[in-house]
């Protein structure tokens, strides 16, 4: 992954991802907790990203060492 954006389905996180897309970056792992929120789902659908992980799944993957270190991490999750 070139970038990980936590909170990437929210207003600020999705706009950070759109800026990354405009700079040619689409190898983005988006991490969030959608909870069935249609607005967040719409935000997530509005930009290119390589993968999406739910917050708890991401935490478990980090603890298990299954997440490749990104070039950049934008921590915008609450």
Where are these predicted regions, by residue range?
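N-terminal Rossmann-like NAD(P)+-binding domain of SDR-like oxidoreductases, especially those catalyzing
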Residues: 1-78
């Amino acid at each position: 992954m070139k970038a990980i954006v936590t909170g990437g389905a929210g207003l600020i996180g999705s706009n950070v991802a759109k800026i990354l897309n405009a700079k040619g970056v689409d190898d983005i792992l988006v991490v969030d907790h959608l909870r069935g929120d249609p607005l967040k789902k719409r935000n997530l659908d509005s930009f290119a990203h390589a993968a999406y992980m739910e917050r708890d799944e991401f935490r478990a993957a980090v603890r298990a060492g299954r997440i490749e270190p990104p070039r950049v991490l934008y921590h915008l999750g609450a």
